[in-house]
Every structure is written in structure tokens, then in C-alpha cells.
A protein has these predicted regions:
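Conserved class I S-adenosyl-L-methionine
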Residues: 1-41, 55
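Intrinsic disorder/low-structure terminal segments
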Residues: 10-14, 52, 91, 106
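Nucleotide donor/acceptor-binding cores
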Residues: 43-45
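Class I SAM-dependent methyltransferase SAM/SAH-binding core
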Residues: 47, 53-99
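A short beta-strand submotif of the Rossmann-like class I SAM-dependent methyltransferase core
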Residues: 112-113
Length: 113
């Protein structure tokens, strides 16, 4: 599995204090532009690669996505995402994006930022 700095406790503590970690998508400077490029998510199956704290998965469900799956290599990120998500239509799993094999047409939208 790819090594990641997010499972280093000191780094993760610092990352957790960044605006994007505290304020979610609204704290990410790229979000206003990215949001305008996204299609209508109602009824769609959405995959978030490198889901971090799960902000996009939760937002996708708020927009009507049928399913949101978040994948991350970091156990720390996944633990935070799971702790702040109660929606059964959101699933988080640990995977290495460099080795990820998905079935054809498994998702309607794949997102990563």
C-alpha cells in the first residue's frame, strides 16, 4: 500500500487545524469553481477518491446522490470520516488508488480534489 503522511499523528494533528479540515468544502479555496463543474447528482452513484474527512461524500448525498463511496489510503482520514457520517448510503473503505480496480460503470461520477 502507498505510504501516506496522513497517518503520522503529528502531521494529522496539523492537517486537522487547516480551514478545509474545519470548514469542509467551504474551507477549500478550489471548491467554488469545482462546484460549478459538477453535474446534477440526484440518483447518481458517486465515488470520492482520496475522500479525507468525507466532506464531499456527505455533500453528494445532500445533493441527492443515491450512493456515495469514499476511498482513502489513510486510516486517520477514514476514522474521521466515519465518525462524522451517519448516512447508511455513504460507505468508506481503505484502498490504494494506484492499485484500485473498479468494475466498468460502477459509478456515475468519480471525484477527487
Amino acid at each position: 500500500m502507498t505510504q501516506n503522511i496522513y497517518d503520522n499523528e503529528e502531521f494529522f494533528a496539523g492537517y486537522s487545524r487547516l480551514p478545509r479540515s474545519i470548514h469542509g468544502l467551504d474551507g477549500a479555496p478550489e471548491w467554488p469553481v469545482l462546484r460549478t463543474m459538477l453535474p446534477d447528482l440526484r440518483g447518481r452513484r458517486v465515488l470520492d477518491l482520496g475522500c479525507g474527512f468525507g466532506w464531499f461524500c456527505r455533500w453528494a448525498r445532500e445533493q441527492g446522490a443515491a450512493l456515495a463511496e469514499g476511498i482513502d489510503v489513510s486510516e486517520n482520514m477514514l476514522a474521521r470520516a466515519r465518525a462524522t457520517t451517519s448516512d447508511p448510503a455513504i460507505v468508506y473503505s481503505r484502498a490504494d488508488m494506484e492499485r484500485l480496480a473498479l468494475p466498468a460503470a460502477a459509478f456515475d461520477l468519480v471525484y477527487s480534489s
